[in-house]
Each structure stands twice: as C-alpha cells, then as structure tokens.
C-alpha cells in the first residue's frame, strides 16, 4: 500500500494516534524507499541493515507489542509511550508521591525489548536529535527516559498544531545546556535563603499571625525573578502578575522589593508608609478602609533585571482565581496603542501576564476556563499568559481525590491546546529550565503555557490551622522533609560550589537582616485613629460636561458616519435605516434616537482625544439591532467601522463581540481600565439579567476597589433593563443590587428616558476619566425605548446643555397636587399615558440619576408646589426589587410629613416578572392607572 506523501508530512510528528500510519509507511519503505517522503527516507535509512526483520517474541499481555511485530515497530511504540505518558512516572513529587493505577507500558521490557537488541539499532530511530550524539537506540532511550521521567514532566502531544508539537519535541529532546554558572547558582541559593528566612522570621516573631506561607513552593519566587529577567532580555518592560494570598507576602517582598520594614510594620499594626522608598520606585496605594495585607498589590519600577521594567502585582480579594481576567485586561491595555486613529495596534512584546493559581482552585473555579478561552481571541489575546500552578496538593483540608476528577489539576488546560510542564518544586534548577522553555514557547507562538509547580504546604491553610487533624499521614512526612533552601544548599556543597560554612552564613545572615529591619520600627507608633473618610474628590456626584457644539459640527460628524467607501455595499434594508439618521439635520421634525445619540457622543469623545473600547455579546450590531457600529458588505462580507473615520479623530475606537462569558469579560474590561485610566471602557450585557454572572466582579472590584485598595476605575456598564413581557429572565438587570452597593459616591447609577441626556451623560463620564473624580457608571439601558419617539430628541438638545439628574415638565405650579417620580421605561409609559389623558394636577418627574440620589434637585421642585398633597414613587419592578427600597429613606426625608408618600408598582415577588406577555400588560396597565388615579 502506498500513502500520499503530503498526507504524512502534514500529519503529527509525535505519532500518537498516527503511530499506525508511521508503521505502515515504514513497511512501504522496506518495499520501495521512494514511496515515502524524503524526510522519512532519511530517518528510515539510519536503521541498521536487517534489524527491522528481527521478529518479536510472542506476547500474551496485550500491552506493548503484538506477536509478529517488527522490532522497529515495538521501539517506536515504546518511544511514543514515553513521550505521551512518561509524565506519569516522572520525579515531580518532593514528598508523598501518589500511587498511579493503570499506567501505560513505559519500560523496555514491556515491549519485549532488551539492551542487546536496542544496541543494534541506530539512535536516530528514537529521535532525530540523538542520531549524532548517541551510538545506539539503547543509549538514546535511556536519555529519553531521564528526560521524560525526570524532575520536569512534559505534556504536549495533545496539542493540535503540528509546528508547536515539533518545536516542543525538539526543545525537550535536544540535550539541554544548563543556563546557570556557579555564580548564578550561588545567587539562586541566596534568593532561596531570603525566601525561606523571611517566612521563618515571621513564623517565630508573630506566632499565629496569618501570612499564608509560601513554604513548600518556595521556588516560585526565583521562578518569577528569572521570568522577569528573561522578559527584560526580550524587551518586555511591563509585567503584570496576579495571584491569591498564598505566598503573596513573599512575592511582594522579594519580587516587588517591598522593604522588610514595611512588611514587619504591617504585622505590628504600625505605619508602614514611613519606610516607603523615597526614590519613587515602589507604588503602594490603599483606600480609606484598606484591606488585609495579603490582598494588597503594588507596582515596582526597577532596573534590577537589565532594563527599566514596571512590575505590577494586582490587588486581589479572597475570591480565588477571579483576578485572572483582571490581569489579562491590564496586560492588553499595556500592549494597546490607543493614541492613534482607527483601531488600536497591539504589541505583545510590550507586556506579559503571569497568573499564579492554586491547585485546588484552578480546576475548581470556572473563571479560569473563561479566561483561558480569551487567550486567542482578537479582542482579548495578550500574546500568551504564563500560568503557574502553585501545587501544594491540598485545598484547605481537601485532598485531590475529593477536589477534582482529573489526574492533574492542570488537566483542564489541555482543552485550550497549550503545553503543560509539571516540575518538582524541590529541584531548583529544573524550575528555572521550565521557565526558560515556557518563555521561549511564548515568544515563538504567542500562546499560553501552564507550569504545574508541584510541592507541598509546610503548615496548615493558615498559620493558626492544624493540618494533622484532617491530613495526618501526609504531614508526618512533610515535617520530616528538608526545605528546598537546605536541599539546594547541600547540593551546592556537594558540588563544591560553596562550603557548608558559607551556606550557614547566608542562612544566618537573612535572620540578621530581618532583625535589623524589625529594630527600626517603633512598636508604640500605632495607627489608632486611621482616616476612614472618602477622599475630597468623591464628595460630589459626577459633574456634567458643558461643552457646546454647533449644528454644523454635529452634522459634519453625522455625514461622515454615513459616508462609506465606494466599493462597500451596505445591506439595502439596513442602509434605509441608517439613512434616516440624516433627518434630524434635514427635517424640522427629525429626531435623534438612542443609537444615533450614542454614535454622536462617541464621535465627539474621540475628537476630544479619549479612546473608547466597547465589548459584549453582539455589541458590534447591538442585541436589539440598533447600534450597527460595524457594517458588513453584503457581497463579500468585508467590514467597515464608521467610528474609525471621525473627522479630527484623536484616539482609537475599539469594539468587539465578546465570547459568551460575563465574569471574565467584565474582569478583563475592569483590568483594562485600571491600567489605562484614560480609556472609556464599556461592557454591554446582552440582557441586563445576565449581568449577575459577574456579580463577584461588581462586589469585589467595581464597587469597592477604591475604598479597599485606592484603585480607581471608570468602567461603564450598559445593562438592558425594562419590563416588556419577556418573562423573568429578560426583564431585570437587578437594579436593586447596584443601588445596594452604592455608597460613598463609589459609582453613578442611571435609568434614563432621554436620548439627549444619554449623549450628555456619556460625555460627562468620558471627561471624568483619568481624574481623581472618576468612578464606574452603571446604565440601565433601554430595549423598546431604543426606537421610541418620546425618548428621541431634536438636535438642539445635543448642541448645548448638559446631563440632567432629573427631568421635569412645564406646568402650572398652582394646580399641582401630586408629584409622580419614576425612571426609565416606567417614566415613558406614564408620560405617554398622560399625553393621552391630560391631568393638570399631576407633575411627572423623571429621576434619571438614581445614585447619587438627586435630593436637592427634587427638593427644589417640591418647594415650588404650594398645593402639593402627595408624592408617589412608581416603578415596574416588584416592591422588594428595583429602586423603591433605596429611594424610600430619601423620599421620606423629603416629604417630612408634609405630604403623603405612596408606592405604586408590582407587589413583592420572588421572581422579577410574569412569564406571560398578556398578564404582563394587565399588570403594567394596573400600575399606571393606579398611580394616576389614586
């Protein structure tokens, strides 16, 4: 049988499932060498004459060989098994190695082979990288076993991309020349001594204090240091690190170089800022309520690694793994050039992310899968994240058998087609090589790499915890196990690189350094009365932008947005819709609807020099087919983005349809905005109802980051919200939750009823970016109101004015007996009802900004109504949801027993809305009529 030559050359070199094809091709070669590709002719020619005809010994074990197989076929099967499964017998466990069941055949004997037979075969059949190094297949296989079963275990045969597999195979099997000379090994030992000495000192001097020790995976710190050095060699100047609490204090101290004095001060509850380096190289921020020490991050600017680099450790809550997309977003922001026209350009060599995981949390938390899914997407890729799993093989008290369904905690990463390296945390030099392989792979392919750093946990989950209660046997062995500091020190002593006295001198010297730092701190300098007031910059609500625009200016923008290339063919049906956007400038009755108001706002913001990034599911078109920010040629599918062609544009416009993810995408956009505070970042939910998939991002980052960490964000959320008969899962963005989180002017929450007010709001938010006044903006965006003529406004409302927290009507104040307050679609429903059923005794007020609540503005209106008897709040949400419970205390204070205060809306409900559209209409009508007539 003759195979197509192309069929093999495009097939995997690491045979795997294609091993049968390889063996068939070898049989073809024996019959006719010209029947196989030239590269295989070269490989097969290295086999010594006659050796392929040595018959296999009969076997009945069903394992490695089959009766009658040639020796070469059995050798190939052995080699293939070593590559695929050698990791299962690798020396990657410092202590308490697991018992492996049903491990595939990996030994020479399993394939009815022996040394004598293998010595007759060329080493080239084992690996093309061995043919000029080893005399025969036996020596080459011994080398392969050492490589694949050593302190680094490799998993890469699952990768679909042939080039990546070939590259990894070559890198793994090419004899490795150690990158560390004797002096570097000495320095590496000193680093380890500082890592462990730091932990020992704190353990001894602050007994029982939580620090979430790094001990057991100490080599993480030199791995990070080496990564930063290699990144510097590549010219990467921005390093973004994300990690949870374990080992964080050590990373802060030895990677970001936070002084020992500062760290010890935090344990003593004295003021650490007295010891902040005066050269400005270390940036540490904190909010007015602050956070525990093992959540805090920082930024270090350093030349320690060869070039000036900015190393950032992201602030992190206790919620494991949720910082991963934040770090990815921060990295992408550092890579993007937003100071140009059109879309931003991305340079993967400007920044890189390092995301550190826990072995229990990595497979357990879905945010990791969402984040890894972003890795190769145009709008989110960072050119490859370095993932390091600090694998201490336990989660609090839960052992792997109860914590995951896979062999390794890293197995979930295989679905994302990335290489996985397992490395023994006690083999210091192996951990350095693992980093070097990972960095070389990232540089070559711009993809994620996972390093599983396999170690242990010296103490319990925290230092007050006794692990032997639930894990007695493993901890008997851990307590007897020498630390990596001692193991590596002894190794260097044995190699003659240092003496035992030098080793002990280094270890003792770290304790002296720590004691010297400790002695500098005045234990009486307690922070008894910390300032917990929000900063002055947050005393006022978001201020309106009052810039005026001429009619001609806005018309020029609008015309440019409708000017497409001559060879671009807009879908005819869509073109008719878009052409109507000329009417506000050409017809007296023409109105600007929501989508056009947004486009005009974005265009003027770009002219002001503020870049915009908008992402979300279906955001390019808009869930409700209203935005059309990216147009598609109906003949060839090419795309055109009008906002890339704004006259006098000074910054980029970036828009992407996101994957079907909420938590990771919101985290990514949050991180992007934190890193690039001048960028107008917007995340749009497909429906507001789905935004609660990101609730942890809202709770732990968006609403509280500034109070905890001094971390400013101006992220904007568009959350479609309105009760329109679409059922309980397509009605509510859970407005009440955002209002519950609102405090200390930490955000702006709006539910708008006017396209022009939307225009001015967006401009106000953009103007606040990269100032001390910036804060998140939460918009309950419309659905049916997108095309509502009551919401649409004439162009003169856009040329001047500013954002209005409330909107009132022109009315005879002497006649008003009742004020109705409502927002969003509820206000429009009431307005349209009153237009058909006029009532001079009712004043309808649109509360556009719910937080900060416009008390003074409403108070002024109420004071002007001498015959007022009743104030009513009307909403479409159930009474226990929506804004009512939030606004009630404000309204109660405003009426001050002068007027009746009543509520009109749905009764308290467990589910937000009715499932039947007709019942919805009945309930909605009842709310409107009740509020008007009662």
From Swiss-Prot:
The keyword Membrane does not apply. GO terms for biological process: glycolytic process; tricarboxylic acid cycle. GO terms for molecular function: oxoglutarate dehydrogenase (succinyl-transferring) activity; thiamine pyrophosphate binding. GO terms for cellular component: cytosol; oxoglutarate dehydrogenase complex. Keywords: Glycolysis, Oxidoreductase, Thiamine pyrophosphate. Its cofactor is thiamine diphosphate. It is an enzyme of class 1 (oxidoreductase). The keyword Nuclease does not apply. InterPro entries: 2oxoglutarate_DH_E1 (IPR011603), 2oxoglutarate_DH_E1_bac (IPR023784), DH_E1 (IPR001017), KGD_C_sf (IPR042179), ODO-1/KGD_C (IPR031717), THDP-binding (IPR029061), Transketolase-like_Pyr-bd (IPR005475). It catalyses: N(6)-[(R)-lipoyl]-L-lysyl-[protein] + 2-oxoglutarate + H(+) = N(6)-[(R)-S(8)-succinyldihydrolipoyl]-L-lysyl-[protein] + CO2. Gene3D superfamilies: 3.40.50.12470, 3.40.50.970, Multifunctional 2-oxoglutarate metabolism enzyme, C-terminal domain, TPP helical domain. Pfam families: E1_dh, OxoGdeHyase_C, Transket_pyr. Its EC number is 1.2.4.2. Homodimer. Part of the 2-oxoglutarate dehydrogenase (OGDH) complex composed of E1 (2-oxoglutarate dehydrogenase), E2 (dihydrolipoamide succinyltransferase) and E3 (dihydrolipoamide dehydrogenase); the complex contains multiple copies of the three enzymatic components (E1, E2 and E3). HAMAP family: SucA_OdhA (MF_01169). Belongs to the alpha-ketoglutarate dehydrogenase family. E1 component of the 2-oxoglutarate dehydrogenase (OGDH) complex which catalyzes the decarboxylation of 2-oxoglutarate, the first step in the conversion of 2-oxoglutarate to succinyl-CoA and CO(2). This is 2-oxoglutarate dehydrogenase E1 component. The lineage of its organism: Bacteria, Bacillati, Bacillota, Bacilli, Bacillales.
């Amino acid at each position: 049988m003759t195979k197509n030559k192309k069929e093999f050359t495009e097939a995997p070199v690491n045979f795997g499932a294609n091993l049968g094809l390889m063996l068939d091709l070898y049989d073809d070669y024996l019959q006719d060498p010209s029947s196989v590709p030239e590269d295989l002719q070269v490989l097969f020619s290295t086999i010594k004459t006659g050796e392929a005809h040595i018959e296999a010994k009969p076997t009945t074990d069903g394992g490695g060989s089959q009766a009658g197989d040639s020796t070469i076929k059995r050798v190939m099967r052995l080699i293939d098994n070593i590559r695929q499964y050698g990791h299962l017998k690798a020396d990657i466990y410092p202590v308490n190695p697991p018992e492996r069941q049903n491990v595939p055949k990996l030994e020479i004997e399993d394939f009815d082979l022996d040394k004598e037979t293998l010595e007759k075969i060329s080493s080239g059949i084992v690996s093309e990288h061995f043919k000029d190094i080893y005399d025969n297949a036996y020596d080459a296989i011994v080398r392969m076993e050492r490589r694949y079963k050593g302190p680094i275990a490799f998993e890469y045969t699952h990768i679909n991309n042939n080039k990546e597999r070939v590259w990894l195979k070559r890198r793994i099997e090419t004899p490795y020349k150690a990158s560390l000379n004797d002096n570097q090994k000495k320095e590496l030992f000193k680093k380890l001594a500082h890592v462990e000495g730091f932990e020992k000192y704190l353990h001894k001097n602050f007994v029982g204090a939580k620090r979430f020790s790094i001990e057991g995976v100490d080599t993480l710190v030199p791995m990070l240091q080496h990564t930063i050095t290699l990144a510097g060699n590549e010219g990467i100047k921005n390093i973004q690190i994300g990690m949870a609490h374990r080992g964080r204090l050590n990373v802060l101290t030895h990677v970001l170089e936070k002084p020992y004095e500062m760290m010890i001060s935090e344990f003593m509850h004295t003021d650490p800022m007295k010891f902040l380096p005066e050269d400005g190289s270390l940036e540490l921020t904190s909010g007015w309520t602050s956070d525990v020490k093992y959540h805090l991050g920082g930024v270090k600017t350093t030349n320690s690694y060869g070039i000036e680099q900015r190393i950032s450790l992201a602030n992190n809550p206790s919620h494991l793994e949720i910082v991963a997309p934040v770090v990815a977003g921060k990295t992408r922001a550092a890579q993007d050039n937003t100071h140009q026209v059109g879309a931003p350009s991305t340079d993967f060599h400007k920044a890189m992310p390092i995301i550190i995981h826990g072995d229990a949390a990595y497979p357990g938390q879905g945010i990791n899968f969402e984040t890894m899914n972003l890795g190769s997407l145009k709008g989110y890729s960072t050119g490859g994240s370095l993932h390091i799993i600090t694998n201490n093989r336990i989660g609090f008290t839960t052992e792997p058998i109860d914590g995951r369904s896979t062999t390794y905690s890293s197995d979930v990463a295989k679905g994302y087609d990335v290489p996985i390296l397992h490395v023994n945390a006690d083999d210091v030099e192996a951990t350095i090589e693992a980093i070097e392989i990972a960095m070389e792979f990232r540089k070559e392919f711009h993809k994620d790499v996972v390093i599983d750093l396999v170690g242990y946990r010296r103490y319990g989950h925290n230092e007050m915890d006794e692990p032997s209660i639930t894990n007695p046997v493993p901890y008997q062995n851990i307590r007897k196990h020498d630390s990596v500091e001692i193991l590596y020190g002894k190794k260097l002593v044995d190699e003659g690189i240092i003496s035992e006295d030098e080793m002990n001198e280094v270890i003792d010297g770290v304790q002296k350094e720590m004691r010297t730092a400790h002695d500098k701190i005045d234990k009486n300098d307690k922070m008894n009365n910390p300032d917990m007031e929000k900063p002055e910059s947050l005393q006022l609500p978001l201020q309106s932008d009052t810039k005026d625009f001429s009619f001609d200016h806005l018309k020029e923008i609008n015309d440019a947005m409708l000017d497409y290339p001559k060879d671009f063919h807009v879908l005819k049906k869509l073109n008719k819709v878009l052409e109507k956007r000329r009417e506000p400038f050409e017809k007296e009755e023409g109105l600007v609807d929501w989508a056009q108001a947004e486009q005009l706002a974005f265009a003027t913001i770009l002219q002001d020099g503020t870049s915009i990034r908008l992402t979300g599911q279906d955001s390019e078109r808009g869930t409700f087919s209203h935005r059309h920010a990216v147009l598609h040629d109906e003949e060839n599918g090419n795309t055109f983005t009008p906002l890339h062609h704004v006259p006098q544009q000074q910054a980029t416009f970036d828009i992407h349809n996101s994957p079907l993810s909420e938590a990771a995408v919101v985290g990514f956009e949050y991180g992007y905005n934190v890193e690039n505070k001048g960028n107008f970042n917007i995340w749009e939910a497909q429906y507001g109802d789905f935004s609660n998939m990101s609730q942890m991002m809202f709770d732990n980052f968006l609403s509280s980051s500034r109070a905890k960490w001094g971390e400013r964000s101006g992220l904007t959320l568009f959350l479609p919200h309105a009760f329109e008969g679409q059922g309980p899962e397509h009605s509510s963005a859970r407005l009440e939750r955002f209002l519950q989180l609102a405090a200390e002017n930490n955000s702006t929450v709006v539910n708008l009823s006017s396209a022009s007010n939307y225009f001015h709001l967006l401009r106000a938010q953009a103007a606040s970016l990269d100032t001390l006044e910036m804060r998140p903006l939460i918009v309950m965006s419309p659905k049916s109101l997108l095309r509502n003529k009551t919401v649409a406004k004439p162009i003169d409302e856009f040329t001047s004015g500013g954002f209005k927290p409330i909107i009132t009507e022109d009315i005879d104040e002497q006649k008003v007996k009742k004020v109705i307050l409502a927002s969003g679609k509820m206000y429009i429903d009431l307005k349209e009802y009153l237009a058909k059923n006029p009532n001079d005794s009712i004043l309808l007020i649109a509360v556009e900004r719910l937080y900060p609540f416009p008390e003074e503005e409403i108070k002024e209106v109420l004071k002007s109504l001498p015959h007022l008897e009743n104030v009513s709040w009307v909403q479409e949400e159930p009474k226990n949801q929506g804004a009512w419970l939030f606004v009630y205390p404000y309204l109660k204070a405003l009426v001050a027993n002068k007027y009746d205060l009543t509520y009109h809306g749905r009764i308290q409900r467990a589910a937000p809305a009715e499932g039947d559209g007709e019942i919805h209409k009945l309930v909605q009508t009842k709310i409107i009529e009740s509020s008007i007539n009662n």
